[in-house]
Amino acid sequence: MDETHENEASDSFDPVFENSYHDDVTFNTEDDDEPPLEPRFKYERLKGEETLPFMKTATFTSIDLHDKFIAIGTATGLIYILDHHGYGNFDSVPPLKPHRCAVSKVKFDETGSYVLSCANDSKIVVSGVGNDKLCCTINIQVMPKSIYFSPDFIRQQSGHCFIMGERNLVLYEKRMFQYKASSLYSGSERDGFIHCCSWNENLIAFTNDTGTRVYERGAERIITSVQPSHDVDRVRSSRSPPKHTWMPENNLVIGWADTVTILKIRDDDGVKKGEVHHIFHVSMFICGISYIPESGIDNMELFLVGLQLEGEDFDDCASVISTVTTLTALESSACTILKTSVIRPLGLKEFELQSEDMIESVKLSNHTLPYMIHGLGIPYLATYFILTTKHIIMAVPYGPEDGIRWRLKYKLYDEALDMAKHNADLLSKTDLSPKKVGRMIIEGYLTGKRARAAASRLPLICGECKEEWEWAVNQFEEVKLCTLLAEVLPDGTPTLDPECYQKVLIACLFNNVKQFRKLVQTWSPDLYMTSFIIDRTQWRIQQISKSGNLADVDETERVLMDALAHLYLYERKYESALKILMSCQDFQIFNVIDKHQLFDLVKDQITELMNINSERALRLLLDNADSVEPSFVMEKIGRQPKLQLAYLTKLMSRNEGTEFADKAVQLYAEYDQKKLLPFLRKNANYNVNKARKLCSDKGYIEETIYLLAKSGNHYDAVKMMVREYRNMEKVIDYCKDQNDPDLWIHLLGVVAEFPAHFSQLIIEASNCLDPLLIMDKLPDDSDIPNLSEALDKLLVDYTNHAELQQCCYDSTLNDLNVLTQGLISAADESVSVNIVSRCSLCAQIIINSNQETTKKFSDIKVFKCGHIFHLACSTSEMERRQSIEEGLCIACSDQIELINV
């Protein structure tokens, strides 16, 4: 039986698939909330399929691609040349009829000028596509399993070579009149058939049951061999044939059964050898393999086409291989699904699944085997084709529109919006523009009862577009969730129609009163009609008061009243606003008064303001001191002494209110004693005697002592300090500050009443008191503790003091003697007068050579200090000053006056 027709099955095509964007694909995920992998491709029928009758009746057996054409081999031996959209011009390029049976393999040369085909009729045929110069038919004795053109087939003097694989790999090279066959590899029966071969530059790869080998032309040797990593006996190559694809930089990708192997051909000093970089298993039987060039060699991605087996005993390919002897048994135990995957190799045996599509729209029978499906691609055109026995499917990379639709389907709204914005120019005139996608997202969130998420994304979706914001407000109003817009609605750029803001305010008024108040406080009143909101707020307050159904009626009313006060302020109804704020005891009333200068409206309600916040009320009173007299304020708060005290404290800190100093002393004494003494020290406007009597009556010791001292009654102050403090250090410091000897004597008399303190006084004040006076004041009939030690210290201190005085006297006397001796020595010295000596007053030379010496000396005046004067200069200067004693040097007198200054 013809092998190509063995187990041939007719597959049906779902008509819904024609215009689908992967919406009908079913993904098996454990978590329904987690979206599947994003598809990388969409799958379309060729547009020309409906125009070609043979497409509906033919059974396809092979396919090859060129940049311009598709070659389709059929079971009847015909080869159709179509463009990539499935259209064919059979007048110019009629169908080829090279074989009498099903076409096993078909290949284009690199230029697309010739098609190489083979079949089980033992023929290899080179057919021309608009060219017949190199056309030929070669009859052989075996049934070829694989064929491939040389890369330079059409080039002159290249030999126009191609290869054929059966058990042997044979090279056909054109001679003068016929092709010459040369065996490159001879295989045995154990090696099986060569089901796949490929040619890249001078490297020929071919695969049989024992593995994949790479043959180097020129060196004419096999440079590497890779053994299969699956069980060849269980998965026969005739049912699941291997697939090759060459990537840049001599990387060979081998897809065979459920394994993928990536082989790198390296050139080490002119010697080529192969290295396996990746080898791993996938969950399908591979029917086609290609790559995605944009990913690059270092981060390559592979495009795989295959069959996944599902059934009672077929959860994955591993179970198929382990439970079924051959794939022919699949017809009774499994169903097949056409599948594509994009994978990225990681390590030697690891890969990352980038996308996975189960194309269930293509209905395959249970008899479908991997050799019946073909997958090819033109990587640099990003175009990939899948061939079944009845259909040609084109896999086109997802565009922005497809990606957005997929994201919207799986509710990946943020990603969909990002993609729409990134491709805004491309999508501006489509139904997936950023604007329309944004609306779809909002509607999706609202339909899915995720209104809060929808609201949070409005700034990103609507941006500064007024129309979009107003549309969104209407959408939220329809679902009665306008309260969610309170935090996101723009109040600047753009500015919406007043109705939009009013809808949100009314929604918050009836559902979230705190949010309503916040909006009233933060939104500009220019955004909405304040009169309308005031009317609705008043009606709502009345409704709440009458119903009494709310659990927290008082709190709700208070919040709404606060909001109403702000609305009145916007309407400049200040009296109504202040009345509400005052009744609610709202702290904000002070800000309102300051901002709008409304003190005159509340100056009669000072007590109420004090009850709200005394600190702010006092500040308000002081800031408006010109509008209200302190006496008026004191009268208003007369029944609240603590408020009076706070007011006077603030008032006097500004050096005002001196007439209330005595009142302040009284209030401090009653309510804040800690501040009384600092006030007494700082202020000088109170009556000292009244203050002293008040402090004395209340038993305020420190304040009383201070007032006694301030009134000059130091004796009583000292006496009180000794009796109350019993701390001699403070008393002694006080006496030292006064520097009054009589006060010390008084202190001794007072301390004599307390013998326990007498020793301490002697020790602390020994330098300030006369020892004889201390001895005289010692009590005769009292036992003074530590008296001997105190007297010892007194005598030691007195002795030291006397010695210090004597030393100072001796030192001073010695200094006087030294200075006197120096003065006498200076007076005994002669004064030299020469030709360069000058008068100390007029600075002229004393000795003039034009005058006689006797005359010159009779005209000068010389002092022992060394200063020389003309007699005339000295006489006139002394007469002018009249303050210089006779016989004193004028120059020295000037220096003494300068020092004194």
Swiss-Prot record:
Keywords: Apoptosis, Cytoplasm, Cytoplasmic vesicle, Endosome, Golgi apparatus, Lysosome, Membrane, Metal-binding, Protein transport, Transport, Zinc, Zinc-finger. A zinc finger (RING-type) spans 839-893. Residues 1-37 are annotated as: Disordered. It is a peripheral membrane protein. Pfam families: Beta-prop_Vps41, TPR_Vps41, zf-RING_Vps41. Disruption phenotype: In 1-cell to 20-cell stage embryos, there is defective autophagosome degradation with an accumulation of lgg-1- and lgg-2-positive autophagosomes and paternal mitochondria close to the nuclei. Clusters of cell corpses in the distal region of the body and show no dsRNA uptake. Reduced number of gut granules in the adult intestine. Endosome/lysosome fusion defects in coelomocytes. Double knockout with either sorf-1 or sorf-2 RNAi results in larger endosomes and larger lysosomes and thus suppresses the endosome/lysosome fusion defects in coelomocytes in the vps-41 single mutant. One of its GO terms (biological process) is vacuole fusion, non-autophagic. Transmembrane segments: none annotated. InterPro entries: ARM-type_fold, Clathrin_H-chain/VPS_repeat, TPR-like_helical_dom_sf, VPS41, Vps41/Vps8, WD40/YVTN_repeat-like_dom_sf, WD40_repeat_dom_sf, Znf_RING. One of its GO terms (cellular component) is late endosome membrane. The keyword Transcription does not apply. One of its GO terms (molecular function) is zinc ion binding. Signal peptide: none annotated. It comes from the Eukaryota. Coiled coil: none annotated. CHCR repeats lie at residues 618-760. It is found in: Endosome membrane; Late endosome membrane; Early endosome membrane; Lysosome membrane. Plays a role in vesicle-mediated protein trafficking to lysosomal compartments including the endocytic membrane transport pathways. Believed to act in part as a core component of the putative HOPS endosomal tethering complex which is proposed to be involved in the rab-5-to-rab-7 endosome conversion probably implicating sand-1, and via binding SNAREs and SNARE complexes to mediate tethering and docking events during SNARE-mediated membrane fusion. Belongs to the VPS41 family. Probable component of the homotypic fusion and vacuole protein sorting (HOPS) complex consisting of the core class C Vps proteins vps-11, vps-16, vps-18, and which further associates with vps-33.1, vps-39 and vps-41. This is Vacuolar protein sorting-associated protein 41 homolog. It comes from Caenorhabditis elegans. The lineage of its organism: Eukaryota, Metazoa, Ecdysozoa, Nematoda, Chromadorea. The gene is vps-41.
